[in-house]
Design a protein with these regions (language model features):
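Conserved beta-strand hairpin/beta-sheet module of binuclear metal-dependent hydrolase folds
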Residues: 1-50, 84-86, 147-149, 156, ...
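Active-site metal-binding loops of divalent metal-dependent hydrolases
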Residues: 8-9, 39-40, 63, 94, ...
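Active-site-proximal loop/helix segment associated with metal-binding centers of metalloenzymes
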Residues: 14-16, 129-208, 212-220, 227-229
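Active-site metal-binding motif and surrounding structural segment of the metallo-beta-lactamase
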Residues: 39-90, 118-119
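Metal-dependent catalytic neighborhoods of phosphoester/phosphodiester hydrolases
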Residues: 70-77, 102, 276-290, 313
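Active-site neighborhood of divalent metal-dependent phosphoester bond hydrolases
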Residues: 83-87, 92-118
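Short, surface-exposed amphipathic charged segments that create phosphate/polyanion-binding patches used
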Residues: 126-135, 313-324
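Cap/insert and terminal regions of metallo-dependent hydrolase folds
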Residues: 178-306
Length: 324
């Protein structure tokens, strides 16, 4: 599984960071999934390998502008490029009203249907052939969710010794079993794929968090999770000065939580625009990493715009070169 950061700034963009957006795919950009769509997201996409024509679904964590203001432009551009495939939009109900109002009041139209799915439904679940997605309620000034992406339909390995022992000769039936299909033989026997195949590895799981001041809400979902992507808007000293109203997390909060549940990989994002990236800048963004490392002993990453990460089948996370 791979994911690319399209924006890592909180609230407003900076010269080096756009507002929130994340592209995620299982094994290549056809199809892919977008989590949040801040202003300028479609511009960021033009510097990556992801195309709006192959976009399968958009997942919106909450209604704040730095997470949704890029939607009208992205959707109408896809239409102008000739998209016809339906697009799922998983989001709070207000997002549908926002999109429809923007399109209605700008003499715009779409060449493809939008399928709106309420992210706040108590029984929310979404899936396609590649991933299954659940979500977790977070703590923010408005309703907010984290999305949990779990790999589906893992490749199967034939139990050849059992097939041979049961007198099942190699042939098309073996291929069907390996694809997860049950097979009815000419002699009337029903072969169940689960009996003659095994899945030799663990399904990969990634949590993509929205804005949240209580990382502990993700405790249950973190069990069996291999990567947590979570906001770290401030260092703790700044969070203390700002006070509780913004309802964001500090690097210290997230790191302590990740350590407590033994998450193997933590990727921090959504940094306040006050943090500078240039050498000598102050306060510097590296202060967030330094604070987190005091409390977290796993693999820590500080996201940058256009950074691409790959979670391998052996569950190791690697940061690749900038996807530009």
């Amino acid at each position: 599984m791979e994911f690319t950061f399209l924006g890592t700034s909180a609230g407003t963009p900076t010269r080096s960071r756009n507002v929130t957006g994340l592209a995620l795919c299982r094994s290549g950009p056809k199809p892919w999934y977008l989590v949040d769509c801040g202003e300028g997201t479609q511009h960021q996409l033009m510097r990556t390998r992801y195309s709006v024509m192959q976009l399968r679904a958009i997942f919106i964590t909450h209604i704040h502008g730095d997470h949704i203001f890029g939607l009208p432009g992205l959707l109408t551009s896809a239409s102008m490029l000739g998209r016809t495939e339906p697009l799922d939009i998983i989001a709070p109900p207000q997002v549908r009203r926002f999109i429809e109002a923007t399109i209605d009041n700008s003499d715009s139209s779409l060449s493809y249907p939008l399928n709106f799915i309420n992210s706040e439904a108590h029984d929310f679940y979404w899936q396609d052939d590649n991933v299954g997605v659940t979500n977790v309620k977070l703590s923010h000034r408005v309703a907010c969710r984290a999305y949990v992406f779990t790999e589906r339909n893992l490749e199967r390995q034939l139990r050849q010794e059992k097939l041979t022992a049961d007198g099942i000769e190699a042939g098309p039936s073996w291929g069907d079993l390996q694809k997860g299909k049950d097979v009815l033989l000419d002699d009337g026997r029903l072969l169940r794929s689960d009996d003659y195949t095994e899945i030799p590895r663990t399904a990969r799981r990634i949590i993509v968090g929205g804005d949240n001041d209580t990382p502990e809400l993700l405790k249950e979902a973190s069990e069996g999770t291999h990567v947590l992507i979570h906001e770290a808007t401030y260092t703790q000293d700044v969070a203390d000065r700002v006070g509780p109203w913004p309802q964001h997390s500090s690097a210290q909060q997230v790191a302590r939580f990740a350590q407590s549940v033994k998450l193997p990989n933590l990727v921090l994002t959504h940094f306040s625009s006050r943090y500078q990236s240039a050498p000598g800048g102050t306060p510097h963004i590296n202060q967030l990493a330094a604070e987190a490392l005091q409390h977290y002993k796993g693999h820590l990453f500080l996201a940058r715009d256009f950074d691409t990460y790959r979670l391998e089948k052996d569950l190791q996370l690697h940061r690749l070169q900038h996807d530009r």
